[in-house]
Amino acid sequence: MKGIKNYLTAVLITCTGLSAFAQDHIYSQFFNAPAYLNPALTGQFEGDIRLNMIYRNQWSGLSGDLSYLSASADLNIPKFGGGVGLLFTRSSEGTAYLRKNNIAANYAYSVGGEDLVLSFGIQAGFTNRQIDWGKLVFSDQIDMRLGYVPGSASSAQVPDFSSKFYFDAAGGVNLVYRNFMAGAAVHHINKPDESFTGTQAKLPMRLTANASFRIPLSSYYGYGQEDDGPYLIPSVVYYKQANVNSVSAGAQFKYRNLNTGLWYRSSGQGSPDAIVVSFIFDIFTNRENGEKLRLGISHDATTSKINYTNTSGTTEASIGFEKYFPNSSGYNKFNGLRCYHFY
């Protein structure tokens, strides 16, 4: 009976997603997906090149697949005051295998000095949206006592198209002032049409605002000096898409190579959604050459009406790598704190 219940829950989620507007996924480890969070964070790190990848397996207890992946590569080009990069994002949702693949180019330009850096970023790319209509379950295929009846036929007529391409654009701004960072971004500025049927279904803009503050816990701390900590870094991220709002708020404790975090996230209407625990490990493979490998793991304990017993929560894993190029001068136009120092 539990299996039938979970299956019907998965079907409901899929059908809801098709009948309403498509809502973007959000990462609990937003700090390990900078290119996805805000294009203005492109090139905002200490080395010459940065690679990031993050995978989210949402509500693994349900039979329908809800998984998301983002991979990015960006270059820090301080002599030109900015950075360039590429971002690939893939999502797979529900038993109907509703999939999105997006590839986008990012560019960011920064102005300022040692104490203050203001960055502006733009993003432009293309998305392919696909669905397998044969995997959908319609109402006339569900028995009130037995649930879904495998092999049963439906009289529902499905659209002729199962794939859609569209252009997508975003922009953002980010400010770093001493131990404070704040940013904002707007995604889907052009509100692309995602419809498979010809009936217009525009993707609403996603608004994101984030802020972090770096609090040194050591009496030996001096601004602008390299220090392994310890630090407390409280952060908040606000998301809004159409009439759905969400807030992630919490703090990270960072000491040397270990970063632990505890977060609270609200659901679309402001009610509790999840408690998130994260662990980040920085492995410096070659400090002199700026080589750093970052490994991250987090788990969301669902607190909403779709409870933890049914969903088994959500798990994210991330990996990042950054380094200087051979024979790099290590020249950095901005010698103060960068976005990297806030996560």
Question: What are the functions of these language-model segments?
Answer:
Residues 51, 64-67, 141-187, 193-199, ...:
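Transmembrane beta-strand segments of outer-membrane beta-barrel domains in Gram-negative
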Residues 1-8:
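Bacterial N-terminal signal peptides that target proteins for export
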Residues 18-22:
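Sec/Tat signal peptide C-region and signal peptidase I cleavage site
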Residues 170-192, 200-256, 263-265:
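Detector for outer-membrane/organellar transmembrane beta-barrel domains
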Residues 23-36, 40-41, 56-58, 62-65, ...:
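Outer-membrane beta-barrel translocator/channel fold
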Residues 43-55, 84-86, 234:
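Transmembrane beta-strand segments of Gram-negative outer membrane beta-barrel proteins
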Residues 9-17:
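Bacterial N-terminal signal peptides
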